[in-house]
UniProtKB/Swiss-Prot annotation:
Annotated positions of the Phosphohistidine modification: 220
Reactions mediated catalytically: nicotinate + 5-phospho-alpha-D-ribose 1-diphosphate + ATP + H2O = nicotinate beta-D-ribonucleotide + ADP + phosphate + diphosphate
Keyword terms of this UniProt record: Ligase, Phosphoprotein, Pyridine nucleotide biosynthesis
InterPro entries linked to this entry: N/Namide_PRibTrfase, NAPRTase_N, Nic_PRibTrfase, Nic_PRibTrfase-Fam, Nicotinate_pribotase-like_C
Name recorded for this polypeptide: Nicotinate phosphoribosyltransferase
Matching NCBIfam families: NAPRTase (TIGR01514), PRK05321.1 (NF003704)
Protein's pathway: Cofactor biosynthesis; NAD(+) biosynthesis; nicotinate D-ribonucleotide from nicotinate: step 1/1
Length: 400
C-alpha cells in the first residue's frame, strides 16, 4: 500500500480551530494531565486493511511544525498567548503515542499521552484516514465532481430561499475531519467564499491562506476530561464551563451542550454562565426540540434570546439548515456548521462516519452520553451508571 505514501498533511494548522483553543487551555490549566482516546467507525466499514497506509501517514506527521508565517498569523489573533504559541512552535507529533492495527478487519487506533500533546492528533488523523480510504476506494472521483455537486446543491438552495430574508443566515465549513481530500475541501471553501452568507471555516490552515474567519470553541473532550479532573463528578460540567471562562473570559464563548445530554447541561447552565457565554452548540438529538429548550431556558433566566447565538452542527446539509433557519431566525441568532455534506459530497462516494473520542483521563474512565444514543461512548459500565446517577439522568442507554 505504498503507492499512496505521499503525505496527506502539509501544515500543522490543517486542523479544526477548537483543537488549538482547547490545547492552549490545557497547556495553561492541565499541563500534566494524561489521556487516552480511541477510534470508532460508527458504520459497518471494515477499514483494517488500510492500517499499514495509515501508519505510514502517522509517521510522516512527526515532520509537521509550525512555520514562521503561521506563527505570526496566530500571534495576531486576539485569544492566543505568547507562552502557548512559543511552546506550539516547538511542538512535534509523537508517533509513539499512536497504535494502529488491523483487528480482524476492523481498524483499531488508540492514542495515549499528555493531554496537551494528544489533543492535536484527532482531527488531522481522521482527515488522513478519510483521504487514504477514499484514495483506494474511489480513485475515479475528483475535485470537479465535488464542485459540480456543490453547484447543483447551491442552485437548489437559491430556489429554496427565494423570497426569504437571508440576512441572519450564517454558514461555516466544519468539514476537515471527514473530507474526501484536502484539495476538495479547499475547492469547496473557495467556492463558498463567493456567497454572502458564508462566514468562515473551522480549518485554521484554510482560514489563514484564504483570509477567512476561523470558527470553533471547545469539543466533548473538554467536558469529558473534567469528569476525572473535578473532585466532584456531579460538578464536573460546571467545572469545565468555569475553567473555559478563566482561559477565555470574553471570547470563544459558544458552549457545547451534549456531553451529558442537553437537559443535564441546562441544569448546570445557570444565569451567570448563560449571561457570559455567547451561545450554545447543538451536536446530537432533535435540533428543533433542542433549540426550543435553549430559547426557553434563556427566557426563564430573564435573558433575551436575541442576544445569544445557537450553532447547529449535527449531520447538517443546506436543506436542513434552511429548515432550521425558517423555524428559529426571528427569535435567536443562528449559525450553521456543515461538514461531510460539503467536503465529501461526490456521486458514488460513501462518506465515512468516523470519530476519535476520549476514553480515559489520568487512567480513569470518562464518558460521553449525548442526546443521540448511538453516539454514547464508554468502556466502563459502572462509570456510566455513576455518571447517570450524578447527573440525575433517566432510562439507561447502551454504551458502546
Amino acid at each position: 500500500m505504498t503507492q499512496f505514501a505521499s503525505p496527506v498533511l502539509h501544515s500543522l494548522l490543517d486542523t479544526d480551530a477548537y483543537k488549538l483553543h482547547m490545547q492552549q487551555a490545557v497547556f495553561h490549566h492541565y499541563y500534566d494531565v494524561h489521556v487516552a482516546a480511541e477510534f470508532r467507525c460508527r458504520g459497518d466499514d471494515l477499514l483494517g486493511i488500510y492500517a499499514d497506509a495509515i501508519r505510514e501517514q502517522v509517521q510522516a506527521m512527526q515532520h509537521l511544525r509550525l512555520q514562521d508565517d503561521e506563527y505570526q498569523w496566530l500571534s495576531a489573533l486576539p485569544f492566543f498567548k505568547a507562552d502557548y504559541l512559543n511552546w506550539l512552535r516547538e511542538f512535534r507529533f509523537n508517533p509513539e503515542q499512536v497504535t494502529v492495527s488491523n483487528d480482524n478487519g476492523k481498524l483499531d487506533i488508540r492514542l495515549s499521552g499528555p493531554w496537551r500533546e494528544v489533543i492535536l492528533w484527532e482531527v488531522p488523523l481522521l482527515a488522513v484516514i478519510s483521504e487514504m480510504v477514499h484514495r483506494y476506494r474511489s480513485p475515479q472521483a475528483d475535485v470537479a465532481q465535488a464542485l459540480d455537486t456543490l453547484e447543483s446543491k447551491l442552485a437548489d438552495f437559491s430556489a429554496l430561499t427565494a423570497g426569504l430574508d437571508m440576512s441572519r443566515f450564517h454558514l461555516m465549513d466544519f468539514g476537515t475531519r471527514r473530507r474526501f481530500s484536502r484539495e476538495v475541501q479547499e475547492t469547496i471553501v473557495k467556492r463558498l467564499q463567493q456567497e454572502s452568507w458564508f462566514v468562515g471555516t473551522s480549518n485554521y490552515d484554510l482560514a489563514r491562506r484564504l483570509s477567512l474567519t476561523p470558527m470553533g470553541t471547545q469539543a466533548h473532550e473538554w467536558f469529558q476530561a473534567h469528569q476525572q479532573i473535578s473532585p466532584d463528578l456531579a460538578n464536573s460540567q460546571r467545572a469545565a464551563l468555569a475553567a473555559w471562562l478563566e482561559e477565555y473570559p470574553d471570547q470563544l464563548g459558544i458552549a457545547l451542550t451534549d456531553c451529558i445530554t442537553m437537559d443535564a447541561f441546562l441544569r448546570d447552565f445557570g444565569v451567570e454562565f448563560a449571561s457570559r457565554y455567547q451561545g450554545l452548540r447543538h451536536d446530537s438529538g432533535d435540533p428543533v426540540e433542542w433549540g426550543e429548550k435553549a430559547i426557553a431556558h434563556y427566557e426563564k433566566l430573564g435573558i433575551d434570546p436575541q442576544s445569544k447565538t445557537l450553532v447547529f452542527s449535527d449531520n447538517l446539509d443546506l436543506r436542513k439548515a434552511v429548515e432550521l433557519y425558517r423555524h428559529f431566525s426571528s427569535r435567536v441568532q443562528l449559525s450553521f456548521g456543515i461538514g461531510t455534506r460539503l467536503t465529501c459530497d461526490i456521486p458514488q462516494v460513501k462518506p465515512l462516519n468516523i470519530v476519535i473520542k476520549l476514553v480515559e483521563c489520568n487512567g480513569k474512565p470518562v464518558a460521553k452520553l449525548s442526546d443521540s444514543p448511538g453516539k454514547t461512548i464508554c468502556h466502563d459500565k459502572a462509570f456510566v451508571r455513576a455518571l447517570r446517577k450524578a447527573f440525575d439522568l433517566p432510562h439507561i442507554k447502551k454504551a458502546s
